[in-house]
Amino acid sequence: MKLILQEKVANLGNIGDQVVVKPGYARNFLLPLGKAVPATPEHIAEFEKQRAELEKAAAELLAKAKARAKKLEDKSFKITANASDEGRLFGSIGPREIAQAITEAGIEIEKREVDLSQGPIRQVGEYEVPLRLHTDVSVNVKIEVAPENSNS
């Protein structure tokens, strides 16, 4: 299926690129999220009119992501959770808890920007967690997981 990208898509292309993808990828991901439109003659003409506007919006998003990355550089955040005497957590810490801790510290982060590809955190300790703020911008933050003070 031939599409025109409306924004930069990792491992696929930039704004305005005409790409050929499998129909399922187009139907289930690119089209519903507004990342692409079918490459019909009407859409091609319409896109050429809007190209400057879309590129300006993309540049603004990139600048905002870089500014947020600069704020997050060399920062560490502390999260407390119930843990056993051996340091195993009762439960786990996932993207939602990490995003909430960073947001409470004053920097807006969405849970979808937290990249816990290695799985949720289940032990007390310090972890380097990558944040993907934009397709071109990522930053690592330190997350310190500490046990809550409890009488167990």
From Swiss-Prot:
Cysteines paired by S-S bonds: none
Pfam family, one: Ribosomal_L9_N
Matching SUPFAM superfamilies: L9 N-domain-like, Ribosomal protein L9 C-domain
Source superkingdom: Bacteria
InterPro entries according to UniProt: Ribosomal_bL9 (IPR000244), Ribosomal_bL9/RNase_H1_N (IPR009027), Ribosomal_bL9_bac/chp (IPR020594), Ribosomal_bL9_C (IPR020069), Ribosomal_bL9_C_sf (IPR036791), Ribosomal_bL9_N (IPR020070), Ribosomal_bL9_N_sf (IPR036935)
GO cellular component: cytosolic large ribosomal subunit
An annotated Gene Ontology molecular function: structural constituent of ribosome
UniProt keyword annotation of Cell inner membrane present: no
Single biological process term from Gene Ontology: translation
Keywords recorded for this protein, A-Z: Ribonucleoprotein, Ribosomal protein, RNA-binding, rRNA-binding
HAMAP family assigned: Ribosomal_bL9 (MF_00503)
Family label: Belongs to the bacterial ribosomal protein bL9 family.
Xref: PANTHER family: 50S RIBOSOMAL PROTEIN L9 (PTHR21368)
Role this protein plays: Binds to the 23S rRNA.
Protein name, entry field: Large ribosomal subunit protein bL9
Species, as recorded: Coxiella burnetii (strain RSA 493 / Nine Mile phase I)
Taxonomic lineage: Bacteria, Pseudomonadati, Pseudomonadota, Gammaproteobacteria, Legionellales
